[in-house]
Each structure stands twice: as structure tokens, then as C-alpha cells.
Amino acid sequence: MARDFSLEKTRNIGIMAHIDAGKTTTTERILYYTGRIHKIGETHEGASQMDWMEQEQDRGITITSAATTAQWHDYRVNIIDTPGHVDFTVEVERSLRVLDGAVTVLDAQSGVEPQTETVWRQATTYGVPRIVFVNKMDKLGANFEYSVSTLHDRLQANAQPIQLPIGAEDEFEAIIDLVTMKCYQYNGDFGEEVVEIEIPDDYKDKAAEARESLIEAVAEANEDLMEKYLEGEEITIDELKAAIRQATLDIEFYPVLCGTAFKNKGVQLMLDAVIDYLPSPLDVKPIVGHHADNPDEEVIAPADDDADFAALAFKVMTDPYVGKLTFFRVYSGTLNSGSYVKNSTKDKRERVGRLLQMHANTRKEISTVYSGDIAAAVGLKETGTGDTLCGEKNDIILESMEFPEPVIHLSVEPKSKADQDKMTQALVKLQEEDPTFHAHTDEETGQVIIGGMGELHLDILVDRMKKEFNVEANVGAPMVSYRETFKTPAKVQGKFSRQSGGRGQYGDVHIEFTPNEVGAGFEFENAIVGGVVPREYIPSVEAGLKDAMENGVVAGYPLIDVKAKLYDGSYHDVDSSEMAFKIAASLALKEAAKVADPVILEPMMKVEILMPEEYMGDIMGDVTSRRGRVDGMEARGNAQMVRAFVPLSEMFGYATSLRSNTQGRGTYTMYFDHYEEVPKSIAEDIIKKNKGE
């Protein structure tokens, strides 16, 4: 079957923003105008097409990146709607990995908000070109100029309007296109009728000035345009469009548009901009992976149907009707349903049962996928998030995604024996879907412990266990994921010798422990000379250290950010074994704990609090009382924003406290930033609690 859309006419885009900026509504309107849905679902009514999980419709937020395909003019647009809540940044990270371009949605009253900064940084890391849509122009306090200024001030972005709004709040009625110098008026409460009108006289000078600024900003990234501009030559619409496109693709410029998705104003022009300025799979650099057997050998996956098949699985979901669904992005080649693929990450052969094109949670079966496509496969049993799928003769591994470790834990106990079996299944499936969700059984207490990125994250997962898997469970209080580390170097010996008739056990190691850089993790160095510890026992020493570090040395928390150098030791020809050296290494760690000044570390969260100015004193006092450190303050319109680092242990239940301190007018976001040493008095309490005193 031939492809329906050429690669040039394909766009893979994401819609990204801060929570409540109107991403999902914007996506809904795109689907409406591209003919994918006939009735528009409003997020605040809990009926949105893209928010298809029950938890999403209850809460009015987007949790999982729903992928959907739409058609605009004769182009195919694959859209991924990403969550704006900070607990779900991993979903954003996953979708950015497989996109070619993105639309950043801003709230016209707030401009760039904390989560916008986070996703913007992620998009920059992955080299994703962006256009900006200033949404909610009909909202009280909407201010287009202010929103654009926040792009410069908070993101240092070379962003320039390619449109101007006429009016704001309930007076917002028309948009001037600065590229074509045409003006579009929206009539009716919901912009049902679009009419092209003359630019009003009182806007002519402003529009001419704004077009001049636009040309200047684009010319900075385009020598030919700069030359024409300096010589005072007329720049044609096509030349300006081409220059904007090139500068956007090179990530040197960000076009800014405006509108109100809820009132259907500006969405069609934004779709035109997606086609005009965001890349096709041919415009982005071919993805580079490495050979499965040789990490140093680069392998390129070109955007070409005739090349070897290569794709990246970026999401796994459980569908109530078809079972496990694996979403993937095809980078090169084609794939037919029913054929076999190789999962080169795990070196497994998989059969693709069916191929589906997704529209939020409805699906259309297709027989073939081509390079540049985003689709879902049924039947891939072994494939997880971040795995590479390729042709059976191909040996490429595409760069996978790195996911943060959980910072918050809860215990969950099934209410009955029947719930226990269902819970085990549910936890396996939820971990397959979400790499930042961890579950394990505590060896001492036998409790099941789940870990995630924040209270909301775990809340929703427990909710899903109940609703999707019918698991009734008792949930414990949240627990912080503390860590331990050494503050000073230590040279120690660990010796294990046992003789009890027959073959004995003997292992002897001398290890130098030194603190590692924050966030660098554990590093092991083999500095043995002359075979005093035979080569075959070296991995056992490292494994023994890693095992012992899992249970810490102070209060039972994992030991991190430590270097261990094995520099001496001894062995016995008959009695030495892998197990003996493993035990010797763990004894060395215990010895080091006596002299290396071990301390407990706690997760520090970066917290950003927005509130009316009159509550500033109360909020600052509250942050300090939670052992927080204020990192900065700035005015945001007529509100104040406080940035601070606060220990996670002090942030439980903060939403309630903020509500009462600001009479419901304050909002906050927080995300994990780094680990920091716990004050001595608090460390003592943690140790006592862990010992059950």
C-alpha cells in the first residue's frame, strides 16, 4: 500500500505548556478544524477527547501523552498532547524525544510559567524547533505584549510576534498577520465566522512597526535578508516566510501567535503556522544511533522508506480492549502488520500483531507504517519505553531516555487475598507504562512500597489500580526517599576468613573510599597491581560494595555519590571464592562507615509559589518554617513569585496550607532538584524512627 502523505507533507508536533494554559483545549480545536471530531469536548466539563483516562477527566488535567493524527489542507499532522503538571515531566520528556516540532502554549495573563520553563529546557535539550501560541486572549487580564516579554526575560528566547491581536479580554476580536499584512476578524460568540478585513487605521502604524521588528529579528539569523533589509529593498511575503521557516528550524527564532482556543479564534492560523514553520521529518537531522555490538560505531537512520526499518518505542499502555499497546515513532524504513521486528535494546525477536493509528483512545487499523509515522503496535510482549525496534538484519540502538529515580514512597497493602494477586498484576503493568514508577517489597516488613515523582503522581497511580484493575488497597503515609553518603575519605581493610572443617572461605580487600561529586553516583576503580587480588574476583568486590550500599550504613538508606578504589588485598589458592570477596567488600564498607563521616541526605525540591502581594510576608515566613531557603523573588503582573528550595519532607500537605494562607489565591509548583545533607537534629530523629525507638 502506498503512503497517503509524503514525508514533506508530514508534521510530528507536540503541544506543551504549564498546567491550565489551555493545551488540551487547543488540541481539541485542532482536531475539530481538521475534521477528526464533530463535537468539541470542553476540558472543564470533563469531556475532552484527548484527556481520555478517567483520572484525567475527573481532574481536568492531562496525565498521559495521547497521540492523535489529523489532516490540515493536504498535510498530515501527528499530535502528541503532553501533560503540564510537573509530576508528569517524564511524559513530556518521552514525547519530545520523538517529535520534530512543538507548539508552546502560554496563558495570555501569566506568560511564561514555571512548568513552561521546564518543558522549554527539555525541548532545547532535544533540539526541538518551536512556535509559541499565546492562548486565552479573551481572559480577564490578558496581555499579549507582557506574554512576549516573558519569553525574552525568563527564557532568553529570540521570540517575535508574527501576529498582532486587536483588542484583548472580551474585546478581543481580530488578528493581524504581520507576514501577509492581512487582518482576520472573528464574528459571533465563538468565532464561527471569519472575515478578512482592512487593518483598522488606528492599528496601521503599530502593525508596520511590529513587521519591521519581525524582519529585524529574522534578519539576524539570515544574511541574505539582512543585506536586502539594510539596502532598503522590499522583502516579499515568500522571502519573509522562507526566512522565518529557516530560522525556526535552526532554533534561532521562535514565531509568536495569538488567539483563544476556547472561543475558536486563531486556531486555523496557528495550524497554518505549524505547516509553514515547523519541520517535516526531512528537515531535521537524521537520527544517529550506535551498533548493538559496538557502542562506538555510529549508525544513521535516515528518513527514507527504502532504508532499513528503525523505530523508537516511546510509550507503553494497557488498553482494556486490545491489551498492551506500544507507541512508537518510525525514523526509517517501513513495517507491515504481522511481520517480525528485532528489539535491539533487549536482543529479542518480536512479532507485530496489529498496527493502529491512534486518535486519543479510539483507533483505526492500518497495514503499513512508513518513516516519519507515529503509530501503536499490538503484540509486542518484551518491548518497553525507550527500546529500539529495527529490521531483523539491522543492528542499530537509538539513544534511549534517562528517567529520574523516585523521590517519594508509599506503602500499599491489599485489603484481601484476591486483591493481592490483582495488585501484583497491576503493579507490573503500571511499571511497564511509567518508568518513573517503582514498586518493590520491603524485605523486613513484607510491605509493598511504591515510589514516584510526587504526591499527585502516586495518587493517580493508586486511583488507577482501583478503577482499572479493581484493586482495593490501604495506602500508608508518604515517605521520603532519603540517601546516605560519606563526607571524608577513608582507607580501610575488609577481611573475611572462615575455617570450619573442609574448604574454608577467604577474601581480603583494601579499599580507599572518597566522596564523589553530587549526583555522580557510585564509581569503582580497580587499582590492583601484580594480581594480589585475582582478576576473576574483582567484579565480586564491586558487586559486594553495590549490594552493601543499597542498605546504607547510618539508617538503612542507599549510599550514593561515593568513589571506591580497590588498591590492595590478598587471596588463598584454595579457600578464596567470589562469595568470600563479596563479603569482604561489604565488611570494608562497614569499616569505612566508622571513619568516613557518613551523613543522611534528603531530596530538596525547587518550589515556585505565586500569590497576591499582600500574602508575601506569611508565605516567606511559612517557607522559612519549613527549613526552606528563598532563592529569588519577582513581580509577575500584579502578583509575586517566590522561588525557594525546600526539603520534600516539609512539603507534605503544602497545598492545603497555601490555600488557607492565601484564601485560595496562591498556586505553587515543585520538582526535585538535588540531594542535600540533613541537619544533625533531624538526622537523629530519622535514625531513631528507623530503629523503631
Swiss-Prot record:
One of its GO terms (molecular function) is translation elongation factor activity. Keywords: Cytoplasm, Elongation factor, GTP-binding, Nucleotide-binding, Protein biosynthesis. Residues 8-282 form the tr-type G domain. It is found in: Cytoplasm. One of its GO terms (biological process) is ribosome disassembly. The keyword Cytoplasm applies. The keyword Hydrolase does not apply. One of its GO terms (cellular component) is cytoplasm. It comes from the Bacteria. Coiled coil: none annotated. SMART domains: EFG_C (SM00838), EFG_IV (SM00889). Gene3D superfamilies: 3.30.230.10, 3.30.70.240, Elongation Factor G (Translational Gtpase), domain 3, P-loop containing nucleotide triphosphate hydrolases, Translation factors. GTP binds at residues 17-24, 81-85, 135-138. Catalyzes the GTP-dependent ribosomal translocation step during translation elongation. During this step, the ribosome changes from the pre-translocational (PRE) to the post-translocational (POST) state as the newly formed A-site-bound peptidyl-tRNA and P-site-bound deacylated tRNA move to the P and E sites, respectively. Catalyzes the coordinated movement of the two tRNA molecules, the mRNA and conformational changes in the ribosome. Belongs to the TRAFAC class translation factor GTPase superfamily. Classic translation factor GTPase family. EF-G/EF-2 subfamily. This is Elongation factor G. It comes from Staphylococcus carnosus (strain TM300).
